[in-house]
Amino acid sequence: MSTIIDVKNLTKKYGDLTAVDAISFSVNSGETFGILGPNGAGKTTTLEMIEGLKGITSGQVLLDGINVHERPRDVKAIIGVQLQSSSFFDGLSLKELLETFGALYGRRVDAMSLLEKVQLVEKAKSQVKELSGGQKQRLSIAVGLVNDPKVLFLDEPTTGLDPQARRNLWDLITSIKKSGTTVVLTTHYMEEAEVLCDRVAIMDHAKIMKLDTPTNLLRNSGVDSTIEFHVDKKCAVDHFKSLAGVAQATEEDHTFRLISTNPEETLPALFAHEKEHGFNIFNLQLRQATLEDVFLKLTGRSLRE
């Protein structure tokens, strides 16, 4: 599989603040590549440097063999970037909007075909202000496709959407990938990364902590299961850290979470601990590891923090 993006020691500093710290990775042609991390991790800055929209402090980005920061105009001709709805021209219909963006690339655009691809044909004569949040996001992706890009960049594409609109957008992104377009996206939704991405880079505090397929990240994390529960008395989380099989114990919003490498050992130990210390456990759930758990083990905090 050929490499379409090659990032080497990419760094961005603002005075004493390091926003992106010497990260390196590659993206394969035709894959959906995700950068997963909380707000402030450096995801958007990384994307903007790869797109050529933000200068770099040091390092190098090659996109389809082109040095992004030496030949930014050549790069912009082969990439698509998701725009925010505030970037759109007021007073134009969706059809006129796509044709206008096409003209900026010197291309004659089949606007209706693009609108069909993003399931907005019935809104062709509407203006952006008349669209729902999910429809605006689909339009922004259509704009990113006007130049038939080799790589489409999506920055937090489903933030703020309701669950159904989010899943509709996932279907759209999957169809774009199936058409042969490489997709690079950032997200702080672990389920989104698991569903959409062939490979995921977990990013925190300006660094890439781990990079692999979602399956391998889960398999090699050393995290097999998570036990979540509430108790009817005030308990310190330290109560549970020494239980058999517990790799990590945390408490958030009155929910205790035990990351266990062996739940068959941990559960009996937990129930014995309950009996010994005179509290009652309720709302107990046992679930398989997710990328949220992998992130927690790597960083010691949740994606929401």
Model regions: which residues?
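ABC-family P-loop ATPase nucleotide-binding domain
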Residues: 1-11, 301-305
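ABC transporter nucleotide-binding domains
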Residues: 4-5, 12-210
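A short local structural element in Rossmann-fold oxidoreductases
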Residues: 73, 218, 296
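A generic structural signal for secondary-structure junctions
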Residues: 80, 102, 106, 201, ...
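Generic structural marker for isolated residues within well-ordered, non-membrane alpha-helices
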Residues: 98, 111, 214, 237, ...
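Short, charged/small-residue-rich alpha-helical element at the C-terminal edge
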Residues: 223-301, 305
